[in-house]
Amino acid sequence: MAGVACLGKTADADEWCDSGLGSLGPDAAAPGGPGLGAELGPELSWAPLVFGYVTEDGDTALHLAVIHQHEPFLDFLLGFSAGTEYLDLQNDLGQTALHLAAILGEASTVEKLYAAGAGVLVAERGGHTALHLACRVRAHTCACVLLQPRPSHPRDASDTYLTQSQDCTPDTSHAPAAVDSQPNPENEEEPRDEDWRLQLEAENYDGHTPLHVAVIHKDAEMVRLLRDAGADLNKPEPTCGRTPLHLAVEAQAASVLELLLKAGADPTARMYGGRTPLGSALLRPNPILARLLRAHGAPEPEDEDDKLSPCSSSGSDSDSDNRDEGDEYDDIVVHSGRSQNRQPPSPASKPLPDDPNPA
């Protein structure tokens, strides 16, 4: 295992993962393996070394399999760790393997971890869930996976959501796909729908839900996904009481504003200081914003609505709170371009703010 120290190098990383997996025999990574709770015999003497390994940054072998996009090693690890707390171990930045997969936009990896039982409500150091991070990096397919009810049992890689359908509309029927042709009623558990629902209302340490994040980043497609999944379109953020409509106006995102209004967002909602979305729109140079709001019944602002509040000003394109809700991420070494959604982001030297255009 000394080769793990060289994981920063592509060749050494592949060699370590491949040799470690290959030395365990042809059936080591078979689905439904003995699991971490099995009694360790001579054939499992390697397990404490692999599952107990942690880098100086707090990354486990599972973190490394995700970072290096090593699918065979990932499948092997999940074969033994599905349904265990190992999936939710956090590195020094509070990131689980699921957080990293979302940051990298690796939808197939997100799905494997999700189906294996990874926690979707675990928050990293900035308070972000995996869905928050998917919204920040515009990983739409990752969000599609996370916005589906979790299957009752882990599925084979050939039977995943991504291979079944390319339609990203969340399934709100709340009926998980059948994974056993002959289920045993005595052993059948209730579908675990609650986690994916709770993601929609989860707040990061700035009080932003995934919908707030998507609106601030002017991502109409992500807003549509969250709307279809049942996100609260009128939930205010805690600092000034801005609803998604207020945030869309401040971001001057007309397409997002129109989407929210057509979906039923309340144009009469007020910030804590009394300002309506239309009152905020009249302070912006884009006339389309006010026109859209008036077309959907927004009331004309009162005199006090014209006063500037501590939360906004009329001089910037986006005056959302530009304080970051997370800390900087580790330098992520990626040596494969297999991302299904997007190219992996370059390492951040500073925290990534929710507001893409800070004042």
Swiss-Prot record:
It is found in: Cytoplasm; Nucleus. SUPFAM superfamilies: Ankyrin repeat (SSF48403). Residues 160-172 have a biased composition (Polar residues). GO terms for biological process: cellular response to lipopolysaccharide; inflammatory response; regulation of canonical NF-kappaB signal transduction. Highly expressed in testis followed by spleen. Residues 318-331 have a biased composition (Acidic residues). Keywords: ANK repeat, Cytoplasm, Nucleus, Phosphoprotein, Repeat. The modification Phosphoserine is found at S19, S23, S313, S318. Residues 153-194, 298-359 are annotated as: Disordered. One of its GO terms (cellular component) is cytoplasm. It holds the Pfam family Ank. Residues 344-359 have a biased composition (Pro residues). ANK repeats lie at residues 57-86, 93-122, 126-155, 206-235, 240-269, 273-302. PROSITE patterns: ANK_REP_REGION, ANK_REPEAT. The keyword Phosphoprotein applies. The keyword Magnesium does not apply. Interacts with THRB (via ligand-binding domain). Interacts with RELA and REL. Interacts with COMMD1. Interacts with inhibitor kappa B-interacting Ras-like NKIRAS1 and NKIRAS2. Belongs to the NF-kappa-B inhibitor family. Inhibits NF-kappa-B by complexing with and trapping it in the cytoplasm. However, the unphosphorylated form resynthesized after cell stimulation is able to bind NF-kappa-B allowing its transport to the nucleus and protecting it to further NFKBIA-dependent inactivation. Association with inhibitor kappa B-interacting NKIRAS1 and NKIRAS2 prevent its phosphorylation rendering it more resistant to degradation, explaining its slower degradation. This is NF-kappa-B inhibitor beta. It comes from Mus musculus. The lineage of its organism: Eukaryota, Metazoa, Chordata, Craniata, Vertebrata.
